[in-house]
Swiss-Prot record:
One of its GO terms (molecular function) is ATP binding. This is Uridylate kinase. It holds the Pfam family AA_kinase. It catalyses: UMP + ATP = UDP + ADP. Its main location: cytoplasm. The keyword Transferase applies. It comes from Limosilactobacillus reuteri (Lactobacillus reuteri). Belongs to the UMP kinase family. It is found in: Cytoplasm. Allosterically activated by GTP. Inhibited by UTP. Catalyzes the reversible phosphorylation of UMP to UDP.
Length: 240
């Protein structure tokens, strides 16, 4: 593993990334491609934990905007992340990759409850661990979950796989042709420039625990491998 920069990582996988161009639900070919890439990285000996979002199924903020109580809407979103986690687990295990799903909301019939020491032990036994259910509390995003779990398991970095976006820009590249991509930023840059890579709570948690972030395009084959090897892909965020 001499050519590996990050030996233990959290991959933040958005729900939208699993939907692909469909924009809603799960796109089976996309799910299969992600699983294949994870298998290749896993075979290098990299310890992988994954935090999945649920935006391809439901967004708590959207539910609240429609008049639903925010906490209730967020709980629905947590259930959406669990559906995505089980789908990803199935895709990985179809490729003979050992996995465990841990949920922040107990549902022992289908997944383990989140236990930090057990999660670390699974990683040490070369199992991919998929964290689902967010933090288990409303008002917290899955980005915050990624930062929290990364700190808890002592991850070397958070890999933020984006759907069709190859890094961090000073404006939305899909709307502004003059948008400029950043290769390197600090955590404080994210907060001061209001760059919307992750919410402020997640950014602060990552900064306080000195956890690097790498934002990259998940849709480009081989990018996860390039990131764990420390190659120049996307935008790297580190330092205060």
């Amino acid at each position: 593993m001499s050519d590996i920069k990050y030996n233990r990582v959290i991959l933040k996988l958005s729900g939208e990334a699993l939907a692909g161009e469909k924009g809603f639900g799960i796109n089976p070919p996309v799910l299969k491609d992600v699983a294949k890439e994870l298998k290749e990285v896993h075979e290098l000996g990299v310890q992988i934990a994954i935090v999945v979002g649920g935006g391809n199924m439901w967004r708590g903020v959207t539910g609240a905007e429609l008049g639903m109580e925010r906490a209730q809407a967020d709980y629905i979103g947590m259930l959406a992340t669990i559906m995505n986690a089980l789908s990803l687990q199935d895709a990985l295990e179809s490729l003979d990759v050992p996995t465990r799903v841990q949920t922040s909301i107990e549902m022992r019939q289908i997944a383990e409850p989140y236990i930090r020491r057990k999660a670390i032990r699974h990683l040490e036994k070369d199992r991919i661990v998929i964290f689902a259910g967010g933090t288990g509390s409303p008002y917290f995003s899955t980005d915050t979950t990624a930062a929290l779990r990364a700190a808890e398991i002592n991850a070397d970095a958070i890999l933020m796989g984006k759907n069709g976006v190859d890094g961090v820009y000073n404006a939305d590249p899909n709307k502004d042709a003059s948008a400029v991509k950043f290769d390197h930023l600090t955590h404080m840059d994210l907060i001061e420039k209001n760059l919307h890579v992750m919410d402020t709570t997640a950014s602060s948690l990552s900064m306080d625990n000195h956890i690097p972030l790498v934002v990259f395009n998940l849709n480009t084959p081989g990018n996860i491998m390039k990131v764990v090897k420390g190659q120049e892909v996307g935008t790297t965020i580190e330092g205060d």
